[in-house]
Structures are given as structure tokens and as C-alpha cells.
Amino acid sequence: MNLSHDLQGLKKKAKETFLYLLSALLLGIAIGAIDAVFGRVLLFITDFRSAHVVVLLPFLPLAGLGIVWLYRHFNEMAAKGMTLVMEAGQGKRESIPLALIPLVMAGTWITHLFGGSAGREGVAVQIGATLSHAFARRFHFPDNGRIVLIAGMAAGFGGLFQTPFAAVFFAMEVVVSGSMAYSASVSYTHLTLPTN
């Protein structure tokens, strides 16, 4: 009876592992494609702004008002950005609105176009987190899809910056913010040694 029970447990683990690997592949492709579009448009916008900075910079305040209008008009909840991601990762939030993806991308593009300062890493993480969280909810992953959420965040960050290992640790750090055991960091330190 123990052998039968062990085999059932092994089959369940194998099925679960396959499901996670398939999900990672599908999400990696989708998140990578969105990141690529985001990054390419951002590079184009940066070049365009550099060539026309004197004309565009005076309109930065109006661009800011336009971004506020976009969030208020389409999805005010999405304005919380990374807070939504952290709350979802900690199980405090049921969903992240999909509208966050186009809004955060458009807001960053507009900001950069008119000479404002906005980071890319937060956008990449939010793209990955939002898409992966929606996927996990749709397919009813265990633990509210926390593993899938972390993988999606890492895919977003790693896809934009081409740093997969750093992305994994960054995503884990964001989700557990403040609750990661310091002893675990000692275990991971050896992974960074070859890069120095």
C-alpha cells in the first residue's frame, strides 16, 4: 500500500512539475514579447526625444496630467502599480487588473517622450506579474499562483535586462519583502562569486 501511495504522490508531483514548466514556457514567450515591444518603443522614443528635447520638454507637465487622466479614465486601481504586485504576492489581493499592463507602458513611454524620469525595471516586473497572476488565477494554481507570479516577475525583469538569475532573486525579494530569512542569503552568495 505504501508503494502505491508513493507512486500516486510521484505522479502528482510529476504532473505538477510539468504544468509549471509548460506555464513558464508559455508565460516566458508572452512576457518576453511584451517586454520586447516595450523596450523597442522606449528606445525609439528616447532617440526621438533626444533629437527634439527643446520642443518636447516644456510639455512635460501636460504629459503628466495626461497620464493621470489615463489612469483615472481607464482603471484607477492600476495606479497603485507595484503595491498591487506585492499585495498579490503576499496573498493580500485577489487580482491585479490587466489594464495595468497598457497603462504602465503608456505612462512610461509618455514620461520618457517628454523628458521625464521613469524606470524600466518596475514596468517590466509589473508586466510579468500582471500577466502571470491572471494566468495562475485562470488555471487555478495552488497557493494562489504565488510561484507563477514570482516566475512571471522574473521573466519580466530578466526579459528586459537579459539577467535571468538576478531577476529570480529580485522577484523573490519583492514578493517576500522583509520576510526573507537572512540565512538564505548566505546560501545564495556563492552564486554571485563567479561574476566578480
Q: What name fits each language-model region?
A:
Residues 1-196:
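Alpha-helical transmembrane segments and immediately membrane-proximal extracytoplasmic
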